[in-house]
Regions:
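N-terminal Rossmann-like NAD(P)+-binding subdomain of aldehyde/semialdehyde dehydrogenases
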Residues: 1-48
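Conserved residues at the C-terminal ends of beta-strands
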Residues: 33, 63, 119-122, 142, ...
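Conserved small-residue-rich beta-alpha loop and adjacent elements
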Residues: 40-113, 137, 181
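A structured beta-alpha segment of the ubiquitous adenosine-cofactor-binding alpha/beta core
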Residues: 49-50, 117-137
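Beta-loop-alpha module in the N-terminal Rossmann-like domain of NAD(P)-dependent dehydrogenases
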Residues: 60, 67, 122-129, 143-150, ...
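ALDH superfamily catalytic-core signature
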Residues: 138, 146-219
């Protein structure tokens, strides 16, 4: 939590109470899911049996942003491992230290070297090289829309499937039957949680007209 706080300039209390526990819970979830992986059979057609099995995709290139680097990296790493894949992770150049420590921790408890790899550098150089690498089978990026367009264009040359989670600009909508005090608390947390640097931040507030004056006065 301290390394993430120093790199990303995020509140230590928020990281220690939310993002770090979330990262641990993500690994718990996928560890439990590993035991449930099995083939599926279907008998909906007479004299036919359909069998579905899952196979690893291979190597995933993962790009994570600075504002929740450890939590989002944990989600990508854990899912890769659970489904039998390896990954090359490029964290934001502004917040790489906690991710490096996480990978060292994973290897210290027995994860084979080379399953989870980290490369550091600027997106325009290291990220571009990773997005066009011939040995990459999947690409996942959490970040800005303009970055996603560049990655998608680069991946197209290799026909590499991509997965994006992109920036948002969400609104809190307050109706006249809402508890005003609770709505204000929720709007404040939504707008300024994680120092306001989060893709689900409530950057706008839409209030029903007949309670607008009361809401604004209380806000």
């Amino acid at each position: 939590a301290l390394q993430e706080s120093l790199c990303a300039v995020l509140p230590f209390a928020h990281l220690a109470s939310r993002q770090i526990p979330r990262a641990a819970e993500i690994f718990d979830f996928f560890a439990d899911y590993i035991g449930q992986l099995a083939g599926e059979t279907y008998d909906q057609l007479h004299d036919y049996r359909t069998v579905v099995t899952r196979q690893p995709a291979g190597v995933a290139a993962i790009f994570t942003p600075w504002n929740a680097c450890l939590a989002l990296s944990s989600m990508q790493i854990a899912s890769c491992i659970a489904f039998g894949n390896s990954c090359v992770l490029k964290p934001s150049e502004f917040a790489p230290l906690a991710v490096l420590q996480l990978v060292r921790l994973l290897e210290s408890v027995g994860l084979p070297t080379g399953v989870v790899n980290v490369v550091n550098g600027r997106g325009s150089v290291t990220g571009a090289a990773l997005a066009t690498a011939a040995g990459v089978d999947r690409i996942s990026l959490t970040g800005r829309g303009d970055t996603a367009r560049k990655v998608m264009a680069a991946a197209a040359a290799q026909l590499t499937p991509v997965h994006f989670e992109l920036e948002g600009n969400s609104a809190n909508i307050i109706f006249d039957d809402a508890d005003i005090d609770r709505a204000i608390d929720g709007a404040l947390v939504s707008a300024f949680g994680n120092s306001g640097q989060i893709c689900i931040a409530g950057s706008r507030i839409l209030v029903q007209q007949n309670i607008a004056d009361r809401f604004i006065a209380a806000f």
